[in-house]
Amino acid sequence: MHVKKGDKVVVISGKDKGKQGVILAAFPKNDRVLVEGINLVKKHSKPTQANPQGGISEQEAPIHVSNVMPLDPKTGEVTRVGYKVEDGKKVRVAKKSGQVLDK
């Protein structure tokens, strides 16, 4: 996958197109990511001991990884991801600026 947990991304298609967020979790087996504040769904919960009120809460649902693109740390624009080997390690590189995306 071209994005990882903690990456700042922009949604490039779907109902939340143009919105930015940080990846909270990645699910490589399903090719999906959970992005902060994106694809909010209403979750209905029954009253329980922990939450006696119950009710409706909003939470993020995963979206397909092809619908997000990482932000270039140098320019702040969306960018494609390339890969380079630096010091024997494979690192992700922003195609627009050549900046390393991995911390």
From Swiss-Prot:
Detail the disulphide connectivity of this chain as listed in its UniProt entry. Answer: none
TM segment ranges: none
Q: Is RNA-binding one of the keywords UniProt gives this record?
A: yes
Record Pfam families:
KOW, ribosomal_L24
CC per GO annotation: ribonucleoprotein complex; ribosome
Q: Which InterPro entries match?
A: KOW (IPR005824), Rib_uL2_dom2 (IPR014722), Ribosomal_uL24 (IPR003256), Ribosomal_uL24_CS (IPR005825), Ribosomal_uL24_KOW (IPR041988), Translation_prot_SH3-like_sf (IPR008991)
The residue ranges flagged as biased composition, category Polar residues, are 47-56
Q: Which UniProt keywords apply?
A: Ribonucleoprotein, Ribosomal protein, RNA-binding, rRNA-binding
Q: Which GO biological process categories is it annotated with?
A: translation
Coiled coil region boundaries: none
A GO molecular-function annotation: structural constituent of ribosome
The ranges of region (Disordered) come to 44-73
Q: What is this protein for, i.e. what is its function?
A: One of two assembly initiator proteins, it binds directly to the 5'-end of the 23S rRNA, where it nucleates assembly of the 50S subunit. One of the proteins that surrounds the polypeptide exit tunnel on the outside of the subunit.
Q: Quote the subunit structure annotation.
A: Part of the 50S ribosomal subunit.
**Stated name of the protein:** Large ribosomal subunit protein uL24
What is the protein's species of origin? Bacillus pumilus (strain SAFR-032)
Q: Which gene encodes it?
A: rplX
